[in-house]
């Protein structure tokens, strides 16, 4: 009888132990969820797949090393439809339904402006990986891509000094990024003694640039500086400009390698500055490109200055979580500015008012749509983006 009681007691203790351990094991296996609201449809649909691919490679690399704090990394792409209404839906879905630990993504400025307050209210860290017009600030918002202070002066100076552009036409998409970048360009042009002959803006969803191109032809500038939204609008504008026979030097504040390549020869000759190009010659970039080719093969979307930063963002977040010993949001935002990720662009640290000093390069689109790096300007500071931080 005692033997039976002993066995029953042993079974009861074993069951209790299993029940006690089960929640711990479940907690250990709970994934770290990274939401990626991005323009899978709309104007950003040209570049969005490359953003997702960068995230997937980073997640694979992290999971191969045991994940984040021993938990698997799960990326959740969400279509923000390249605009504010879609961003509101995507951010709410990512935070409420998918229980995102962090949001890491590239978006239009309109989408970011709609989504960022949702992340801020929910106290979810948001690493914004897109170049943008600057001055977006929040306790939970971090930016690892360029702002106007880093790319506009080098581009305008090059075109002024070496392409002899003094009289300019300025063209932009009619939203925060387009107008913000053109404002920065106008200031730099005037500071360098140049003249703005005309300034025109196109509604974001409109693809016919005929009226604006007619005004450029009438103004007869030495050169053009433009800033559309990322992706397709660049190609629409440049194709129509080429068809109109306008051949003056062009500087872009919105194009990227993937978009230029997708446009065939439409962007041939266009100059642009940025913090990432596939032609950057360093070991980490070579390793990154090889890993991307190995993972995606024929499906690979050319890594570019709107997608590579996603890869950096995931790794920086992982480093912050490991350093903090937790994925708790308040702990993460304290540690995030202190981590330095050595990646394809070089050393990146979001320690300047939640923005990052970045290496900046000058490049030009070739006849086949490929981009050639022409010059390395070195590390450039983002300036005062959020002075109260």
Pin down the residues of each PLM region.
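Extracytosolic ligand-binding ectodomains
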Residues: 2-389
């Amino acid at each position: 009888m005692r033997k039976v009681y002993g066995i029953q007691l042993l079974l009861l203790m074993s069951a209790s132990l299993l029940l006690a351990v089960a929640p711990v094991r479940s907690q250990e296996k709970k994934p770290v969820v990274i939401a990626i609201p991005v323009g899978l449809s709309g104007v950003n649909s040209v570049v969005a797949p490359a953003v997702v691919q960068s995230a997937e490679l980073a997640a694979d690399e992290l999971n191969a090393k045991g994940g984040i704090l021993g938990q698997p990394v799960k990326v959740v792409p969400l279509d923000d439809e390249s605009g504010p209404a879609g961003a509101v839906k995507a951010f709410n879905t990512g935070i409420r339904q998918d229980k995102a630990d962090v949001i890491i993504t590239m978006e239009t400025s309109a989408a970011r402006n709609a989504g960022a307050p949702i992340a801020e209210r929910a106290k979810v860290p948001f690493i914004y990986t897109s170049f943008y017009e600057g001055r977006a600030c929040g306790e939970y918002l971090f930016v690892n891509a360029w702002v106007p202070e880093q790319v506009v002066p080098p581009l305008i100076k090059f075109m002024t000094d070496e392409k002899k552009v003094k009289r300019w036409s300025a063209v932009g998409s009619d939203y925060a990024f387009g107008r913000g970048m053109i404002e920065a360009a106008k200031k730099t042009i005037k500071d360098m003694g140049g003249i703005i002959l005309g300034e025109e803006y196109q509604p974001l969803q409109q693809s016919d640039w005929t009226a604006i191109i007619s005004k450029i032809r009438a103004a007869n500038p030495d050169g053009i500086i433009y800033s559309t939204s990322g992706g397709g609008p660049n190609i629409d504008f440049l194709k129509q400009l080429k068809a109109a026979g306008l051949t003056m030097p062009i500087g872009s504040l919105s194009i990227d390698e993937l978009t230029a390549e997708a446009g065939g020869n439409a962007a041939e000759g266009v100059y642009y500055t940025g913090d990432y190009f596939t032609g950057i010659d360093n070991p980490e970039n070579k390793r990154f490109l090889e890993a991307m080719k190995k993972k995606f093969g024929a499906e690979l979307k050319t890594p570019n200055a709107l997608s590579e930063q996603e890869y950096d963002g995931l790794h920086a977040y992982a480093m912050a979580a490991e350093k903090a010993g937790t994925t708790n949001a308040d702990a993460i935002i304290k540690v995030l500015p202190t981590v330095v990720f050595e990646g394809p662009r070089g050393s990146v640290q979001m320690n300047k008012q939640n923005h990052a000093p970045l290496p900046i390069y000058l490049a030009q689109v070739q006849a086949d749509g490929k981009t050639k790096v022409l010059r390395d300007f070195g590390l450039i500071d983002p300036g005062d983006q959020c002075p109260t931080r």
